[in-house]
A protein has these predicted regions:
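N-terminal secretory signal peptides that target proteins for export/translocation
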Residues: 1-3
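Extracytoplasmic metal-acquisition and chelation regions
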Residues: 5-9, 13-16, 21-249
């Protein structure tokens, strides 16, 4: 009887060990991936191409929402504080950031790119440097492909600090991404410089970097702010430009 009980107990223990072993080896990992939060799509695109498999990442400002007027919710701020990295454009594009406490794990991309001084700031003494006053610069710098390359480098260097990310894979993805940007730059040079009409009439002036690179002239209805109301004088001027230069599309 005692031998029978011992055999039964031994069998139960063996089954328990086998069960635990398979639970550990066959169950999917419940470890959470490090989270990276970005403010706009240009950063989202870079992160997606560099290491989307190894991290959880999301764009803070929803598609279709005006970047300039966006305000984060308390839930958004909690997510930012808990993230492994928060990336934002800077240069005044996200006004809510000014005066907001941000943890050390943040990256202001405007500090590593070439910025255009706004026309109304041109009469101020200005020097290219890393610490600048916001709102003196056009914040739409990612439309310059060279700036996208600089942004990709800065983001890659920050991602390398996250221990869960495979460094060699990240470096290779970065090189692939830079190659694709160079190819896009060549296409731009081949097509945009040969445009017959160099006048761009826009509702919202977000294309000054492209205009500078490829010799376009920008005529903007609402300036840098997409929700600004144009004056009657501006509308008359735009109408004259459209007629004079045979602009077919605004």
């Amino acid at each position: 009887m005692i031998e029978k009980s011992s055999s039964s107990a031994l069998g139960t223990n063996i089954l328990l060990v086998i069960f635990i072993f398979f639970q550990k080896t066959s169950s999917p990992s419940t470890e959470r991936k490090p989270e990276v939060i970005v403010s706009t799509f240009s950063q989202y695109d870079i992160v997606k191409h560099l290491c989307s498999d190894e991290i959880s990442f999301k764009m803070l400002i929803p598609f279709g929402q005006d970047i300039h007027s966006f305000e984060p919710t308390p839930k958004d701020m909690i997510s930012i504080s808990k993230s492994a990295l928060f990336i934002y454009s800077g240069a005044g594009l996200e006004p809510w950031i000014k005066g907001t406490y941000l943890a050390k794990n943040t990256l202001d991309l405007s500090q590593s790119v070439h910025l255009h001084v706004l026309e109304e700031s041109c009469n101020h003494d200005h020097e290219e440097h890393h610490h600048h006053e916001e709102n003196e610069f056009d914040p739409h710098y990612w439309l310059d492909i060279d700036n996208m390359m600089s942004s990709a480098l800065s983001i890659k260097n920050e991602l390398l600090k996250i221990k869960e990310i495979k460094k060699e894979k990240l470096e290779q993805n970065y090189l692939n991404y830079i190659t694709s940007l160079n190819e896009l730059k060549i296409k731009y040079e081949q097509t945009l410089k040969s445009c017959a009409n160099p006048i761009l009439v826009l509702n919202h002036n977000a294309f000054s970097y492209i205009a500078a690179d490829y010799n376009f002239t920008i005529e903007s209805i609402s300036g840098l702010s997409s929700d600004a109301m144009p004056s009657a004088k501006t509308l008359v001027h735009i109408n004259e430009v459209v007629k004079e230069h045979n602009v077919s599309t605004i």
